[in-house]
Structures are given as C-alpha cells and as structure tokens.
C-alpha cells in the first residue's frame, strides 16, 4: 500500500452477535481460535496484530508463508493457530482386512482469511469475494499455510460440520464488504448461533 504505511495497519474487527439468519448476501467461515495478525510478505516478513502491535510469530511459519506466496509483496490477514490437528488418516494394515488410524501430531499453522495488498496494489476497496479469489491465486495452501474455507449457502448444515470439528463460533461476512484496517466492521459478524 504505497499511500499507507503497513506498520500502521491492524486487523479489521468483526462485530459480535449472538444469532444471525442466513442471507445470500453473506458468506460463512469458521472462527479460528488463535492470534489474529496482518502478515506482510516482502524482504522482511512481519506480523502485526490489533493496535498495530508486533505479533511474535514463529520464524519458520513466516518463512513458510513467504514460500507459499507467489507475489513479491503482499499483506495477508489471518490467524496463527497453535495446536492445529488434522483429521487422522486411515492406513492399510499388514493384512488384507487390517487398517489403523495414523494420528498426526498437533502443530502451528497460519490460516489466511483475506488479502489486503498484492505487489503494491491496495485491495482495501475491492469487494470481499474478489479479494478471496485473488488470495486463492496468490497463496498456495500447504500443511502449515491454509486458506480458510467458506460457503455462501447451507449455513446450518455447514455449521453442524464445523461444530463436529470443534468450532464454537462462526464469522459471517457480507460478500461486497470492503476492508477497514483497525476498525470494527458491521458487515463482518462473529456469531454463536445460526
């Protein structure tokens, strides 16, 4: 963002509500538990949290974010999640009728939810779904760098799936919402019930 100093930016905050009715004007994402940060990708990668404070992110995770980003410079909004556990894999056993579950150890991951800048081009005034499309084009998922999933329909059935995975809250975002760094945006709502 040529006209805005990146170090002065902070993540946008969602408004909190107890309930929200499904609407075609919104998407639904899981509310990840962890440390929210804006990650700058460039010569010196860094993470900035609320109130513009530096987030002490693991160096190897910042390096993984840089490696998985196809742009020279970018600003990503996301969550550093500690203790992330994937679903266990079913592995074939020695015998024809044998199988076992391979448990995957917990690890730290970065889950990207938005893209605010790419190669000096600000995306703050770009609608959310277009920013998500560009995020998917710029950031390649890996075991340690993830893109948050989202849906536009079927909130309740997807909510059931997310609850089974341990999510207790959800974020609904207006599809045409713009990004307002450091502000609370009424078009992003964190909810407990759908």
What are these model-predicted stretches?
Residues 1-194:
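Catalytic cores of nucleic-acid ligases and guanylyltransferases
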């Amino acid at each position: 963002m040529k006209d805005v100093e990146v170090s002065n930016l902070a993540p946008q905050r969602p408004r909190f509500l107890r309930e929200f009715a499904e609407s075609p004007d919104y998407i639904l994402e899981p509310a990840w538990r962890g440390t929210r940060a804006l990650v700058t990708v460039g010569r010196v990668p860094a993470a900035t949290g609320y109130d513009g404070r530096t987030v002490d992110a693991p160096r190897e995770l910042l390096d993984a974010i840089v490696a998985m980003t196809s742009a020279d410079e970018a600003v990503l909004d996301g969550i550093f999640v500690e203790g992330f556990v994937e679903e266990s894999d079913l592995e074939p056993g020695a015998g024809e009728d044998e199988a076992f579950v391979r448990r995957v150890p917990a690890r730290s991951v970065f889950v990207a939810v938005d893209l605010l800048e790419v190669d000096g081009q600000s995306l703050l005034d770009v609608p959310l779904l277009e920013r998500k499309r560009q995020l998917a084009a710029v950031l390649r998922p890996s075991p340690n760098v993830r893109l948050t999933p989202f849906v536009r329909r079927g909130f309740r059935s997807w909510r059931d799936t997310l609850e089974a995975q341990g999510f207790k809250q959800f974020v609904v975002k207006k599809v045409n919402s713009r990004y307002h760094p450091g502000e609370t945006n009424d078009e992003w709502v964190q909810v407990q019930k759908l």
